[in-house]
């Protein structure tokens, strides 16, 4: 019964476990890939070159547990029993958690490509390509879907809204413009998942700023200098950002004003 599944997570190369939401007991475990003879040693676990390495985390939607690998595979497992439903290759490493909505699965790879797949068959429906700078952070933004529109961030420092049906761009908004003379100084990845709350969309860039913008056209409502590559959270009319110094910052959703900051976790790698 898929409704009893509380968590689905990867415990190694190709090994996935589902846990009962009421008892915490294991419901099922499956091995969709084998780790090239490495077993589960620490050295093997850290070897991202292994094709079975799950690089994109686990996403849940459309009755599926969705995983992305360093090989560029999107793997769909049944949430109910762990059966592999399909597997599709998008070309390069999946850098974030795949997302599913309304019969489609969306996955972003580290080459700046967003791919839409049929949730029942894994067949490719469309792709959208963004320009990737020479030097970027490892990982990518996970797509988020609302009202048949896909929103995602890219290493270019931009957030893009696309029609979920065909990948047609609706709008594009720059969160941060690259600045500085060196490639390191010019890294402005939007690696955190765009956050939708209170009828607005929020995004944050590394070495850049946080922006609250209109869902309809991407027009900025406010901007606040900060730097982060971690996912945001929201609640009580605020968004919460963990910046690159591990300071937790609460920002008012409407005004963009900082409500409070908590520096007690500095340099603790939140």
Predicted regions and their residues:
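Hydrophobic beta-strand positions that form the internal "hydrophobic ladder"
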Residues: 6-7, 65, 105, 150, ...
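C-terminal soluble interaction/assembly domains
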Residues: 241, 247-253, 259-270
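Extracytoplasmic beta-rich repeat domains
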Residues: 1, 29-59, 84-101, 124-147, ...
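Beta-strand-rich domains and repeat architectures in extracellular enzymes and scaffolds
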Residues: 1-12
